[in-house]
Regions:
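Enriched but not universal
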Residues: 1-10
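Catalytic core of pol beta-like nucleotidyltransferases
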Residues: 10-87, 95-307
Length: 307
């Protein structure tokens, strides 16, 4: 079995389908009552989040309460929460005191802040996310460590300190900006994504209808090329968004955030993410079929070798 054949086994129908996004919704008058009682985080939500987080971190690290601050951030804790999304997004930013982390976990003494945050995030993705994608049956709860521990410098929509049980950045009623130049750039993304999905769909149909090995191989190659291009475009849109929430970014009003949100609303982001996930799943399956184990990526292997 080669990689192209493995990718074909993970292939499925992909379409660009518009959907609602909180960014373009009309701000409400209240915060989400499922999470807040008035402006205060419901205690049952607070305890569930901290229990999930600390139970996970204690499996791999010492004294997590000593080196973490925990914040709910993003649209889920803003006045723009009412857009119909199932599940709804709930983002939890974990701020790490890296000096204290190294004191509590001596085996990481030689690691950089970025390497530590990457290691913790990988644990969140692999081990915690499968248990939080349907948090309280309603929310997709995502934990994430930003290498910058200063929450105010990340320009979030709003930020609630879960440990101290208070607002650090109070939410404001925000409305989406309108900029003709931005729309032109978004249209280029849409056009490119539409062409990629069209070529992917054509290749997928040819793979299913191939009558001989030559036809199948050609179709699988075309499919893999479309998946690769879609993955690159998704990563560009996704990774560029982080610029909005770093020092120098404009947060909610930043172009990179608008680009993400507009492409999410049009259906471009979900479609490209399907291609990206498809590639990742195929790579993991191919590694397992070839080597008998799921191989970590190169950066992970380097980080672990330094421990």
């Amino acid at each position: 079995v080669n990689y192209y054949e493995t990718l074909n086994q993970h292939a499925n129908d992909v379409e660009i389908t518009p959907s609602e996004t909180s960014y373009f919704s009309t701000p409400g008058n209240t915060l989400d009552p499922r999470i807040f009682q008035g402006s205060v985080l419901r205690n049952v939500v607070r305890e569930a989040i901290l229990t999930l987080l600390y139970n996970h971190l204690q499996l791999g690290y010492n004294e997590p309460q000593a080196w973490t601050n925990v914040y709910l951030a993003g649209s889920g804790v803003s006045f723009n929460w009412e857009a119909h999304r199932d599940p709804a997004d709930l983002d939890c930013l974990v701020s790490v005191d890296y000096v204290q982390f190294r004191q509590s976990n001596q085996e990481y003494k030689g690691w950089s802040d970025r390497e530590i945050s990457a290691e913790i995030n990988q644990g969140f993705r692999n081990e915690l996310y499968p248990r939080t994608e349907t948090f309280m049956g309603t929310f997709e709860l995502t934990f994430y460590v930003n290498v910058n521990p200063n929450i105010k410098e990340l320009n979030p929509y709003a930020a609630y300190d879960v440990v101290s049980d208070k607002w650090v950045i109070a939410p404001k009623a925000e409305t989406a900006v309108s900029n003709p130049e931005w729309e032109s750039a978004i249209e280029r993304d849409r056009s490119m994504a539409t062409e990629i999905i069209k070529r992917y769909a054509s290749a997928y149909e040819k793979v299913k209808g191939a009558r001989n090995d030559a036809m199948r191989i050609n179709a699988e190659t075309a499919l893999a090329h479309a998946v690769h291009q879609g993955t690159l475009l998704f990563e560009d849109i996704h990774e560029s968004r982080s610029n909005a929430f770093n020092p120098g970014g404009a947060g909610y009003h930043d172009y990179n955030n608008y680009r993400w949100q507009a492409n999410k609303q049009s259906g471009v982001v979900p479609a490209l993410k399907k291609l990206s996930d498809m590639a990742k799943e195929a790579q993991e399956s191919f590694a397992y079929e070839t080597y008998g184990v799921e191989l970590p990526d190169v950066s992970t292997l380097i980080r672990r070798a330094q421990r």
